[in-house]
Amino acid sequence: TKFATIRLGYHGDTWNAMSVCDPITGMHKIFSGALTAQIFTHSPKIPFGGVWDDSDLAELRDTLRKRRDEIAALILEPIVQGAGAMRFYHPEFLKGARKICDECGILLICDEIATGFGRTGKMFACEHAGIAPDIMCVGKAITGGYLSFAAVLASREGEAGVFMHGPTFMANPLACAAANASLDICVRDGYLKRVLQIEKILKAELESAKEIGGVEDVRVLGAIGVVEMRESVDVEKIQEMFVGRGVWIRPFGRLVYLMPPIVISDEDLRKLSSVLVSVLKEISKNV
């Protein structure tokens, strides 16, 4: 059996995870001849906040129905396609994917490594669509970024058939302590309100980037702000400009984006945003 997934996705740099990353944008072309060939369908076309049209699910529905006997699971990033595209897609696509998986007897895996624990304004991005996956992958913010730690969550039905495996570094006590402390903060009153405040500031501060020549799109969801350029940026040059102005921002390809820590101050967030906009204005004048 194989995994099905959508294009423009990114799921990490370990061997099998690379096989479900987009073969073009996933940064793993060097391994393309050796990775397992998985089943890809188009990425969602309708953006978050757009007018929904069920035709956006047509290819996924057709593929899963026709190839259900060879598909073990559908894996995707819910709502936000991260390092592969920094795109925000319509929640109805995820809701429809859940329904199709149920119809075809296929497990749904949601990769919440980047989106989990409030990043999109909901505790988990799946909540935007009102669905629960059979398996959920979480990491990054589970420890607040202090220690490497990840977890795989499963429904009772999904867990029932799993062969138990105990990796060497499983349940590291120090990482578990950091995760418990981070989760205590996540469930406090005001945590998600802070994410929405970050969203409000990002929308206001990045608005002027829409007027910069060479900018294709500006989009914000929760504590994620993205400026998409029409052409790839000179990463070395633009990073030098950012550092020279006292901030660290990592652009890639045509994307310059912010995913600040939730504890960032309003002042620091405004500085990050204003430097991003000023640098893009400067480089656009020299093109």
Spans of model-derived segments:
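Conserved N-terminal phosphate-binding loop of PLP-dependent enzymes in the Aspartate aminotransferase
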Residues: 1-287
